[in-house]
Design a protein with these regions (language model features):
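Periplasmic/extracellular electron-transfer cofactor-ligation site
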Residues: 24, 39-40, 55, 61, ...
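Solvent-exposed, polar/charged alpha-helical surfaces in well-ordered, non-transmembrane soluble domains
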Residues: 58-69, 92, 105, 109, ...
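C-terminal motif of bacterial Sec signal peptides marking the signal peptidase cleavage site
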Residues: 16-18
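Bacterial signal peptide processing site
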Residues: 20-22
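Flexible coil segments in periplasmic/lumen-exposed cytochrome c-class electron-transfer proteins
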Residues: 24, 42-43, 65, 101-104, ...
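Electrostatic cytochrome c docking/interface patches
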Residues: 27-63, 155-156
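Bacterial N-terminal signal peptides that target proteins for export
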Residues: 1-7
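Short Fe-S-cluster ligation motifs
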Residues: 98-112
Length: 156
């Protein structure tokens, strides 16, 4: 019983910490962004085995809603995320050419392994391969920025 409370308290603390951070300097952002872009993202040739169906797209949207919206917003474009502009490097817009240029295999690799120093956590072991591939499918079909509101956790 104490473990779930500890986990919830830790997650809440991590989310609230982001709300108190000052925006990074331009130099800091450039250095961290440069470093992030030097990371070799693997799995380039892997193909998404999850077929594009309404059911699989809904599963990807649901998994994204559970694991990704706290940082990336419902639309994948950080809408309503209060600390998005204070992260160093800034959280990427998941519809941006910089993100969408990745192959499906590379997107899965990023979700599996995370990216340091960006703060993107690794999900390997937390999510099944099918869940990750469904999230990748969802990332290819994100709604327009601001069209679906902001995460409920930040709207109060």
């Amino acid at each position: 019983m104490r473990l779930p409370i500890s986990i919830a308290a830790t997650l809440a603390s991590a989310l609230l910490c982001g709300c108190k951070v000052s925006a990074p300097s331009a130099v800091e952002s450039r250095i961290v962004t440069f470093t992030k872009h030097q990371i070799t993202v693997g799995n380039k040739s892997a193909r998404n085995p999850v077929a594009m169906t309404a059911e699989n797209l809904a599963a990807g949207k649901e998994a994204f809603g559970h694991y990704c919206i706290a940082c990336h917003g419902i639309d994948g474009q950080n809408t309503g995320v209060p600390f998005a502009d204070r992260m160093s490097p800034p959280l990427p817009l998941l519809t941006s050419p910089d993100v969408q240029r990745y192959t499906d295999g590379q997107l899965k690799w990023v979700i599996d392994n995370g990216i340091s120093p960006s703060g993107m956590p690794a999900s390997r072991g937390m999510l099944s391969d099918d869940e990750i591939w469904s999230i990748v499918l969802h990332l290819r079909h994100l709604p327009p920025a601001g069209s679906v509101g902001e995460p409920e956790m930040y709207s109060h």
